[in-house]
Amino acid sequence: MNFGTMTFYTILFIIAVLLLLARLPIIGFYIRAVYYGLCLMIGGFVGGIASIPYGKSANNHFRMFKIFQFMTWPMGIEFELRNAEILNDEKPYIIIANHQSALDVLGMSYAWPVNCIVMLKSSLRYFPGFNLCAYLCESVYINRFSKEKAHKTVDSTLHEIVSKKRKVWIYPEGTRNANNELATFKKGAFILAKQANIPIVPCVFSTHKFFYNQAEKKLTGGKCIIDILPEVDSSKFETVDELSTHCRNIMQQHRYKLDAEAANLNL
């Protein structure tokens, strides 16, 4: 048996063992979680390399997202996007979404508007592969632990909105939250909307719990609903707090509705 044949059968054996191990709940969870992380790294790196000839552009996201969706297809996670036409508005707006887990990166790829940048926590600039794509997609990093740096980020993002008519994707909870109740919203997204005098577009994802649960070591195939709600006119609210509270309330109520629907979809 020559070296090539041995290598081929060795690879087949490893794949077979991994497939068998993946059927064990806990081991399967870690295999799928590692696979998803690799998809993020490789998808971001390949998407980044493919985007170099085009230079820095917010629309490089679509190249990376297509690669990422293709790579994660074997995981069996499906997203149903509703009211997508709201995203097609050419004017700038802030899109806010609830943030549950790392799977939100895959979810956002199905609801991404043209000429949009994302505000990311600063630690992600060190995530291999992903950071290259984020750089070429003109993503914005925000330091949540430094008010001074956070304010500078908000100011630079405001300039992007005004000068390039950008849309900005923000997770107002500020961190992952797998609970049924949305966390208290941070003010950054709403300050931006008020200062730029642009609307807010709420984006609500149904719960991931039917296919992903960190505590239970569960990561399987499943279905998630993404619903784009009508835009909220920021100019109709006197204060940032009023705007933030209103947006959180409508998103929370809609989240309950979507979770009930998702329960039936994931039977």
Locations of regions flagged by a protein language model:
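Short amphipathic alpha-helical segments and helix-helix/interface helices
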Residues: F68-Q69, M108, N131, L158, ...
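Non-catalytic C-terminal accessory region of glycerolipid acyltransferases
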Residues: F8-I11, H151-L267
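Short acidic-hydrophobic, aromatic-tinged amphipathic segments that line or gate anion-handling sites
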Residues: L81, V140-N143, S234
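Catalytic core of membrane glycerolipid acyltransferases/transacylases, capturing the structured
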Residues: L40-R63, P74-M75, D89-K147
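Hydrophobic structural segments
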Residues: F3-T7
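Generic preference for hydrophobic
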Residues: L81, I95, V118-M119, I226-I228
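Membrane-anchoring hydrophobic helices of lipid-metabolizing enzymes
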Residues: F8-Y93
